[in-house]
Curated annotation (Swiss-Prot):
Statement: the UniProt record of this protein carries the keyword Transcription regulation: no
Residue sites binding Mg(2+) 2 per the record: 219, 221, 277
Binding site for Mg(2+) 1: 34, 86, 198, 200
Protein name: Probable RAD2-like endonuclease 369L
Keywords associated with the record: Endonuclease, Host nucleus, Hydrolase, Magnesium, Metal-binding, Nuclease
SUPFAM superfamilies: 5' to 3' exonuclease, C-terminal subdomain, PIN domain-like
Function: Probable endonuclease.
Family note: Belongs to the XPG/RAD2 endonuclease family.
Cofactor: Mg(2+)
Region called I-domain, residue ranges: 163-297
Organism: Invertebrate iridescent virus 6 (IIV-6)
Molecular function (Gene Ontology), one example: metal ion binding
Length: 415
């Protein structure tokens, strides 16, 4: 997701743009959370647990535990999150979305095929190398090449573990997931907003309007929108026996521009040339070459004059840069009048109410979430935050019947 190879480029060319500081710098400030990104992150972590435990005691809703702990950790440090949910996307993203969907389907089919080969091979005598299924040989060759191992030393257990790891990449966000998360956020009395467009675009809009202080995401699109990007939270990292400190790491947008010696418009053109979710990059021109061209030519139009016009694969037409510029410069403001609770967002950061422990207990039981709520409650009490015992959501949660559908979220409007 995001700008193709941008973070890799930054780490190699401008590592100093990554800033790590004490998390208390965000205390009493509003932070927009790019919720879809965190859903993918936490669902992937939950899938990893399934792999580690061989599927034993696996709970497909276990990813909600991560959101509970995340919210608790933010509140512990007096950080005020606003979870931004997805609302739509521009039509230029259709190609990317379809490609990602096909990739997930291909991964799933390949994984099932490999598992069938593993099952078949496991029941055979496995006496001769020629008995090894071809697809398992190919997987082993990939492993051997990556780890500098002899190709002839086929290791069945290593291949089995490698195939098992593939389940971590079969991650889908469904309507059911969104409904469960909304229930959790209500019970935790944590604000969330349904964006009228893509979540990261609305986050960028709030940042530029100075309604929020920062954006938590791993989506490098945030940089193309011209915003600082909080890429990591580290909670209670132990430094020594007596000292614990929590940190944040973010990419400083202004420092990045200064270090790369680019204006904001030039940086956006650089991002477009790298390739985005809305356009492909020019054939055989990656991030490094794109930077070199923009650094000298200053804009995509001038780059077009520099390239060979007879090379159909090497023209700027594939970039669709006028439309993509418009998306990054104006798309975040589209349908903004449809957003509810804007007055709430503009208020000074404060917790309007505290989590409802009774309903949270009900939720963890209903969705079979394994979490030590007493430990969480004790943490809130240490922060002088008391649990609410009554809530307007109680009746709704008790009667909740989330539709058990695994349909992916693909019904968002296209703008």
């Amino acid at each position: 997701m995001g700008i193709k190879n941008l973070t890799k480029f930054i780490k190699e060319k401008c590592q100093e743009a990554y800033v790590t500081e004490n998390i208390n710098e965000l205390s009493f400030k509003k932070i927009a959370i790019d919720t879809p990104m965190y859903m993918y992150k936490y669902k992937s972590m939950n899938a990893a647990k399934m792999v580690e435990n061989n599927g034993i005691y696996y709970n497909p809703d276990g990813w909600l535990w991560s959101f509970i702990y995340f919210i608790y950790s933010l509140r512990k440090h007096d950080i005020h999150p606003i979870f931004i949910l997805e609302g739509g996307y521009p039509e230029e993203k259709n190609k990317t979305r379809m490609a990602r969907k096909k990739d997930r389907e291909d991964v799933k089919k390949k994984t099932l095929s490999l598992e069938e080969s593993i099952s078949s091979y496991a029941t055979s005598l496995r006496l001769r190398p020629e008995d090894i299924p071809q697809d398992l040989k190919e997987e082993w060759n990939k492993i051997a090449k990556k780890n500098n191992l002899p190709f002839e030393d086929f290791d069945f257990e290593t291949v089995k573990d490698h195939v098992k790891q593939r389940h971590r990449y079969d991650i889908r966000i469904t309507n059911r997931d969104y409904e469960k998360l909304k229930i959790l956020l209500k019970i935790m009395n944590t604000p969330f907003i349904q964006a009228p467009m893509e979540a990261e675009a609305f986050c960028a809009y709030l940042y530029k309007k100075k309604i929020i202080h920062g954006i938590a995401s791993n989506d490098s699109d945030i940089l193309a929108y011209g915003c600082n990007l909080i890429v990591d939270f580290e909670f209670d990292v132990k430094i020594d026996e007596e000292t614990k400190i929590s940190k944040i790491t973010y990419i400083n947008y202004d420092y990045l521009l200064n270090k790369l010696d680019l204006q904001s418009s030039e940086f956006l053109d650089f991002c477009i040339m790298c390739g985005t979710d809305y356009n492909d990059n020019i054939y055989r021109i990656g991030a490094v070459k794109s930077y070199e061209l923009i650094k000298v030519q200053k804009c995509i139009e001038n780059v077009g004059k520099f390239l060979d016009p007879n090379n159909k694969k090497g023209t700027i037409l594939i970039l669709n840069h006028l439309r993509i510029r418009h998306i990054f410069n104006h798309y975040g403001m589209k349908n903004i009048d449809d957003v509810t609770n804007m007055q709430f967002l503009e208020k000074k950061a404060s917790w309007s109410s505290v989590p409802n422990f009774y309903l949270l207990t009900m939720l963890t039981i209903k969705f079979n979430i394994n979490i030590d709520l007493e430990w969480i409650r004790h943490g809130f009490e240490k922060c002088n935050i008391k649990w609410d015992c009554e809530s307007e959501y109680e009746e709704n949660v008790e009667k909740t019947n989330v539709e058990e559908t695994n349909n992916e979220v693909d019904e968002f409007p296209i703008f």
